[in-house]
A protein has these predicted regions:
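Residues forming the flavin
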Residues: 1-222
C-alpha cells in the first residue's frame, strides 16, 4: 500500500506474489475476466531496497520466488507470456542460478532489467504499464493481464514490540543479535537467543537451519 502508483488495491489486475501463490496451488490462474491470461508481468523489489518505503535492505527471497513462480506459470499455461522486471537478480542459494537460466532457456521467461513507474487499468480490465528498459535505455508501454508485485519481508508488529520490550530492537524493527557474523543467535541480554526471520528476511530453509543452531547454543549455555 506504500506504492500507490502501482495500483494495488485499486486495480483488480494488480496482485501480490502471495495471492499468485494461492492461484498456482489451486490451479486457478485467471485474469480479472476469469480467462486464461495472455501475459503476466512480475515486478521485483516492491517494498525492499526502496527509499520511499523506508526499507533499504534486500528481502532475499523475492528473486528466487519470482523465478519459481514464473516457471510454474509456464508449466501450467505454456502459451502465456511471462515478463520479470528487476533491478538486480539475487539468486541466493545452491541451484538457484541454474533455475534462473532454466527459466530463460527452457521456459522462455523474459527478464527485463528496469523499473515500472506507473500502472493503470484499461477498458478491457487489463493493466497498462509504463516502464523503462535500463539496459537498452528505452521506454516501454505494455498491457498485461496480471501485474504481480513481489512484496518484501518486514518485521511484524509482534516482532517489533517483543524486541523493543526485551531491549534487543535493531534496524527496521527486527531483533538485533550480538554479532551477525560470530554470535548471530546471541543477544546483548544474557539468556536471550534469537533465530530466523525475527532478525532479518530469511528463507524457510535458512530459518530452520538457524533455529537448529540456536538450539545448540542454548544447550551449550545451560
Amino acid at each position: 500500500h506504500q506504492k500507490e502508483e502501482l495500483g494495488y488495491g485499486i486495480y483488480k489486475g494488480v496482485i501480490t506474489s502471495i495471492e499468485l501463490e494461492k492461484m498456482i496451488k489451486t490451479d486457478s490462474i485467471v485474469n480479472v475476466n476469469g480467462d486464461k491470461p495472455k501475459q503476466i508481468t512480475f515486478l521485483q523489489c516492491v517494498g525492499s531496497r526502496d527509499e520511499k518505503s523506508g526499507n533499504h535492505y534486500c528481502s532475499k527471497v523475492c528473486c528466487v520466488t519470482a523465478v519459481k513462480q514464473a516457471i510454474e506459470i509456464k508449466k501450467i499455461l505454456p502459451e502465456t507470456d511471462v515478463y520479470v522486471f528487476y533491478m538486480d537478480l539475487r539468486m541466493w542459494g545452491q541451484g538457484f542460478e541454474e533455475m534462473y537460466r532454466t527459466a530463460q532457456e527452457k521456459y522462455g521467461v523474459n527478464f527485463v532489467r528496469g523499473r515500472i513507474s506507473e500502472a493503470a487499468a484499461t477498458y478491457d480490465n487489463r493493466v497498462q504499464i509504463k516502464a523503462e528498459d535500463t539496459l537498452m535505455g528505452l521506454p516501454l508501454n505494455l498491457n498485461t493481464d496480471l501485474l504481480v508485485l513481489m512484496v518484501g519481508m518486514c518485521a511484524s508488529e509482534g516482532t517489533k514490540q517483543l524486541a523493543k520490550s526485551a531491549g534487543i530492537d535493531g534496524l527496521y524493527g527486527f531483533a538485533q543479535s550480538k554479532s551477525e557474523h560470530l554470535y548471530d543467535n546471541f543477544t546483548e541480554q544474557d539468556g536471550l537467543f534469537v533465530a530466523g526471520a525475527c532478525k532479518r528476511p530469511s528463507s524457510v530453509n535458512d530459518t530452520i537451519q538457524d533455529a537448529r543452531a540456536a538450539a545448540v547454543n542454548i544447550l551449550n549455555s545451560i
